[in-house]
């Protein structure tokens, strides 16, 4: 194994599979970066910053299966996607706004 170092890029692929029912996997690329040491901490920490931003397809989301915290995370993620990509997408801005509208 190789220890993580700032600047390394890896894939974050959380997933959940309910046997015989459904499964989901969401994947983004993240970059390793220094993270502030907590007060009283005795060593430097690393964290991750998401590099790839893309709306999660709403047609695949069953909001009733998500907790309030999960819905809040999804809406915050979509708000970030819209804010960061809006200046870059030109004619696709309307599509982006629709894809990133709040679920909760």
Q: Which residues does each predicted region cover?
A:
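Charged, cofactor-coupling segments
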Residues: 1-104
């Amino acid at each position: 194994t190789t220890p993580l170092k700032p600047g390394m890029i890896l894939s974050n692929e959380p997933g959940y599979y309910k046997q015989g029912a459904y499964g989901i996997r969401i994947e983004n690329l993240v970059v390793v970066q220094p993270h502030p040491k907590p007060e009283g901490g005795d060593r430097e920490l690393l964290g991750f910053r998401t590099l790839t931003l893309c709306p999660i397809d709403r047609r695949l989301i069953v909001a009733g299966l998500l907790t309030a915290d999960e819905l809040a995370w999804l809406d915050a993620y979509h708000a970030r996607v819209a804010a960061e990509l809006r200046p870059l997408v030109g004619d696709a801005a309307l599509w982006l706004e629709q894809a990133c509208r709040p679920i909760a």
